[in-house]
Amino acid sequence: MSDKRIAEESRFAGLALTEEELVARVAWCYYHDGLTQNDIGERLGLPRLKISRLLEKGRQSGVIRVQINSRYEGCLALETELQQRFGLKLVRVLPALNTVPMNVRLGIGAAQSLMGVLEPGQLLAVGFGETTMSCIQHLSGFISSQQVRLVTLSGGVGPYMTGIGQLDAACSVSMIPAPLRVSSAEVAGILKREASVRDVILAATAADAAVVGIGSVNQRRDATILRAGYISEGEQLMYARKGAVGDILGYFLNAAGERVSDLEIHHELLGVTLDELAQLPTIVGVAGGEEKADAIYAALKGRLINGLVTEETTARAVLALAG
């Protein structure tokens, strides 16, 4: 800005403007003319800090009203409401669109969110399911460039690892070399004592962040854990009768977010426990679809996740359940 222009504009500093007039003038220059706070300060003969305070006062008083004309506007409001309602560290709500499979869209959203959380060389723990693998697939370039290490939270992830084939050969990936569920509690106990399983589980409990899928009994035959053959339709119905609304890592939760008691499957799983999962600093749940609202709400209520990536229809349903 020229000295002449500054001199011309600084005449406003000597005017007996009311505070509202001053707020309006500052807001016009900032939002309409696109001037920086420093430029406005020079024009009005005011320090930049004063300009900043006037803008904040304008927003608080209603003189300044910011309108976001975007399909993301409602999603941003939902993110704020979810964050405040559940005390989330991270939340991402995607617009409801039918043009791309939901798992893919959620995976992209989760990958973008994790890029803002993970530091170079940190350890990311990965749960069972298609959506989490979609996330890792879209995060693969970041994982390679930042040398983020991967560890699985449970067994059964091996078949999905084809989704991260783009990872650099130097990347560290530790997998539990076993299925999600085995035939009995005795077999699970034996395998957990094997170093190849025990060491990976131990590493997972020290992860810097985790990403997990959330299954729902409302999905019926579409539930990943059922399609993968780890439970039968009969078991799914029985779990629902006992109060289960969904699962994380194969552990079935009731509406309060507590593990449903007296289920054999809970003793036959290979991986970290829900208590161990809840101790991690950042646990991002990735799930969408109105049929999953009960399960997502349970996970939030039980504080099993402190981050959420979902889509707007699901977010509204979860908030409706929360009242």
UniProtKB/Swiss-Prot annotation:
It is found in: Cytoplasm. The keyword Transmembrane helix does not apply. Gene3D superfamilies: 3.40.50.1360, Winged helix-like DNA-binding domain superfamily/Winged helix DNA-binding domain. It comes from the Bacteria. GO terms for molecular function: carbohydrate binding; DNA binding. Inactivated by phosphorylated autoinducer-2 (phospho-AI-2). Phospho-AI-2 acts by binding to LsrR, which is then unable to bind to the promoter regions, allowing the transcription of the target genes. Keywords: Cytoplasm, DNA-binding, Repressor, Transcription, Transcription regulation. One of its GO terms (cellular component) is cytoplasm. The keyword Repressor applies. InterPro entries: NagB/RpiA_transferase-like, SorC_transcr_regulators, Sugar-bd_dom_put, WH-like_DNA-bd_sf. Pfam families: Sugar-bind (PF04198). Residues 37-60 bind DNA. Transcriptional regulator that represses the expression of the lsr operon in the absence of the quorum-sensing signaling molecule autoinducer 2 (AI-2). It also represses the expression of the lsrRK operon. Acts by binding to the intergenic region between the lsr operon and lsrR. In the presence of phosphorylated autoinducer-2 (phospho-AI-2), LsrR is inactivated, leading to the transcription of the genes. PANTHER family: TRANSCRIPTIONAL REGULATOR LSRR (PTHR34294:SF1), TRANSCRIPTIONAL REGULATOR-RELATED (PTHR34294). Belongs to the SorC transcriptional regulatory family. This is Transcriptional regulator LsrR.
